[in-house]
Amino acid sequence: MTTRIKVDLRSDTVTRPDEPMRRAMHEAVVGDDVLGDDPTVQELEARYAELVGKEAALFTPSGSMANQIAVAAWTRGGDEIICGAQCHILEYEYGAPAFLARVLAREAPVRQGSPDPDAVRAFYKSGAFHSSRTSLLCLENTHNRLGGVIADQGLFEEL
């Protein structure tokens, strides 16, 4: 007998915690994360840093916040970023790259859930004479507006 599990990858907002998850949230030891006193957040950040092979990790309560921190950290005011068409940063984050990081977002056509590498090459700007500098390529996986499609890993590698 085959068991089918439905996984909805459109957005983190469509997830629903089951009873064991709710129990874990209820029983979690908490503290003030701003003061560095929340052991649950500390454990989560340490586990994730180890998982991805980094020195440290930062918990953010939303994907939008994580996106905007990354954009601000990897760019300077006046830079350009390239995003895939209909990506979350462009469609659902209220112009935050322009407002918070002071960068212009360019929208590249998407192929199989990924910005098209040929379009990205065509849009890239070095920052030479009278042009802004492309400083960041934003990749979304899974692609929200395309129904949660998983981006083609080969295209990501090409980028």
Predicted regions and their residues:
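Conserved N-terminal alpha-helix of the aminotransferase class I/II PLP-enzyme fold
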Residues: P17-G63, A85-E91
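N-terminal amphipathic/basic leader segments beginning at the initiator methionine
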Residues: M1-A24
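Solvent-exposed alpha-helices and their adjacent loops that cap or buttress functional pockets
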Residues: T2-T3, A49-V52, A73-T75, A98-L100, ...
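Active-site-proximal loop->helix
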Residues: Y92-L104
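PLP-dependent aminotransferase-class I/II
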Residues: A101-E158
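Conserved core of the PLP fold type I
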Residues: E55-T75, A108-P109, N141
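Conserved PLP-anchoring active-site segment centered on the Schiff-base-forming lysine
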Residues: A73-Y94
